Regions:
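Bacterial Sec-dependent N-terminal signal peptides
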Residues: 1-31
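Structural motif
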Residues: 65, 97-99, 162
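N-terminal post-signal-peptidase region of extra-cytosolic proteins
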Residues: 52-54, 71-86
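Mid-length scaffold segments of soluble, non-membrane domains
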Residues: 82-135
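Amphipathic/hydrophobic helical signal segments and adjacent flexible N-terminal regions
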Residues: 23-58
Length: 184
């Protein structure tokens, strides 16, 4: 009798443990499915936000109303990279003018001397906007009230909002700036 009772208790205990493990396994499977659904929803939300950002940046560039804020500058070829901390440095492109306030190193051979281009250009020549695989390529030219023609070239990356801007001239080494594009 004792033996039967011990066997019965053992069987009941095994059944309880079995049901508990089965319930935990079902709950774990349910949690995995729930997490997978949440993960897919977050991926879709991020993809939608990225697409909306690209569309916003595309419309900003096409409107000809944007602001470039440089973070670094480098004289080409192979000049020293300099961080720009002054928040006043920017190039603002409007449909009717271009506002330039940006540092530049003049000179073809050392010693170079730093200047700040601080002009409002009421007219620019050859304003061209081209869509590329990675974003946009914008170029225009201006004399900036000198005898030298300066070419401004923007490479704008739609995926992450960054831009590389190059100012070139036949009489000076080119300067390259990296920064961000903002709508105005």
């Amino acid at each position: 009798m004792k033996r039967t009772l011990i066997i019965a208790i053992g069987v009941v205990a095994l059944l309880i443990v079995g049901f508990t493990i089965s319930g935990v396994a079902q709950e774990t499977q349910s949690n995995k499915e729930s997490r997978q659904a949440q993960h897919e929803a977050r991926q879709q939300q991020r993809a939608q936000r990225l697409a909306e950002y690209r569309e916003h940046l595309d419309s900003t560039i096409l409107s000809h109303n944007y602001r470039f804020v440089p973070e670094t500058m480098q004289q080409l070829p192979a000049g020293m990279m300099r961080n720009l901390q002054n928040p006043c440095y920017e190039i603002i492109v409007w449909s009717e003018a271009v506002d330039v306030c940006i540092p530049f190193l003049k000179g073809y051979t050392p010693p170079y001397y730093p200047v700040v281009f601080n002009y409002v250009l009421s007219s620019v020549q050859g304003y061209i906007v081209e869509q590329t695989d990675y974003g946009w390529h914008v170029t225009f030219q201006s004399t900036m009230f000198t005898a030298t023609t300066f070419t401004f070239s923007f490479e704008i990356y739609s995926h992450y909002g960054a831009a590389t801007q190059t100012i070139s001239s036949p009489f000076y080494n080119s300067m390259q700036y990296t920064g961000n594009i903002f709508g105005i």
